[in-house]
Amino acid sequence: LTSEAPASPGLRRIIVQPVLNVEDVKAVENGLSEQGVSISELMRRAGGAAAEEVMRLEDVHAVAILVGFGNNGGDGWVASQVLQSHGYSVTVVSPVEPEEIKSDLARLVAKSAEDAGVEIVVGPPREDLMEILSSSDLVLDAMLGTGFHGEPKPPFDIWIDTVNAAGVPVVSIDVPSGLSAQTGHAPGACIVADETVTMLCLKPGLISDEGRDVTGGIIVAPLAEQTERTVLDNDPTAWRVEPADYADVVAPHTNNVDKYSRGSVLVVAGSSRYPGAAVMAAKAAARAGAGYVTLAVPVTIAPLIQMQLPEVPVVGVAAEQDGTFSAAARPVILKLAERSSATLVGPGMRVTGGTVAVVSALINSKAPLVVDADGLNCLARLTNGHLDEFPEVTRRDAPLVLTPHCRELGRLVGLADTPPDSLTAALEAARRIVWADGGSELCVVAKGTATACVGVEAALLPEPGTASLATAGSGDVLGGIICALLARMPDDIEDLPLIAAFGCEVHAVAGSRAAKRYGSRGVMAGDIADEVGLAVDELEDHVSSLVAGAAEDQEPSL
């Protein structure tokens, strides 16, 4: 779909937005109503915003609008009348006659559209529906709205499958029908949209899990001047980060540097079973810009690791017979951490008495620390799977970044058997940890299809990566990137979630670059690590250009 006109105030063509839970969106609607923008007026504006987006698209003359029983369908009825008044050929497909619609508001606007002469087809069989769709230039989906969850029931399941099979471009109103706007799950039939015009603000399900595959381009329609303030008053559950927000964490380009001023990183990782994890993490830290990387590994694998990383000093420390860290390694590791700007612990360590002792020692140190992979599993063992009930473990005088995927996160908060299965659930679990701690020195990076960087004050959602990141060792690369960024930050930096989010975006860009070389299914962790340096440059250049452009826009004209 291509658009031919600039956006009006009713449509905001940006991705970066506060994200509200569905129940809080209802509170925003009620708040706007109290400020004089009634629910019926919001429906009128929502339908108008959807119609406005359709009218921006090129080569669209005939529009099929599929409506449901509720207010989402009401938006579609409003859009039908607006489009017809602008000369479009419009056909509304409804499950019932207008007078049989249960929602009072939707019934009123449906009757209005009927009185205006909009063509209405009620409950067509699949063959007739396919004929309507095939003769249309675009489908406007207004069947199931933000209150939907579960699997679509007839006739909507059949209609959804028919729309997807028709091959006609689709614009969804608020949310693609069949998708949960809260969880991002779509267990049954679900519209695959080319664009989604969502009202008031983003919802978690639009940007996570199946939502990423079915929403297409997302356009937010604020609908009212008061919306921004009202959304903020309802405490967004998360925030999508825009590139310009990274200006404070982008390192200025200067030749007045040395290897230590770029930050020194210690990586404590590896075992005889997983030596590659240490290699991936250390290489990623170096590629991400750390000037000096030291790798501490069990002495039994040190020669093997050193052959893989000739540029990185490899320190072999005390090991058990099974090739894992011994508790006796703690003094050496703590001394190395004391000399480093930041430390990463966990990749490939395994979970043993010795590794638990090493992780515990580092947690109790004053080293800025990133804990990943088995380091997190060691933390789970230290706290009996309830890190949120042991805030003294994470309450320290130095930055601490935890980078769990959903299963690791579940093990940390007593949900090992039922790990978080959505962005919403991951946010809730991560907040149990950071709110128990209560300090600004802790950030939980809840990795998933939509990764959340959760601090005590806010949860940030970086631009997500592609499926190329779903490969063994990819998380080790991310841990190295975040540790390198942490190492070069000033001591007084307070926004750990923003640093972590930038690291996630570097990781995503590196994965995309690797996919161009090896294919989306052929990428290995080492390929991602090799692209990290160029990914950092690409993102930093983009951020710098945005900041420079914004500065030029603010300069007074002569």
Question: How should these model regions be labeled?
Answer:
Residues 2-95, 102, 195, 206-373, ...:
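Small-residue (G/A/S/T)-rich helix-start motifs and N-terminal tracts that mark the onset
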Residues 52-143, 149-173, 357-360, 365:
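Nucleotide and nucleotide-moiety/phosphate-recognizing core
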Residues 104, 151-152, 184-185, 414-417:
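Short, solvent-exposed loop/turn segments at secondary-structure boundaries
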Residues 116-121, 147-151, 319-324, 347-350:
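Short, flexible loop segments at the rims of nucleotide/cofactor-binding pockets, characterized by
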Residues 125-128, 177-181, 204-205, 375-378:
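Short acidic loop-to-helix transition motifs that present clustered carboxylates
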Residues 137-138, 143-236:
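Internal gly/pro-rich beta-alpha loop/helix module
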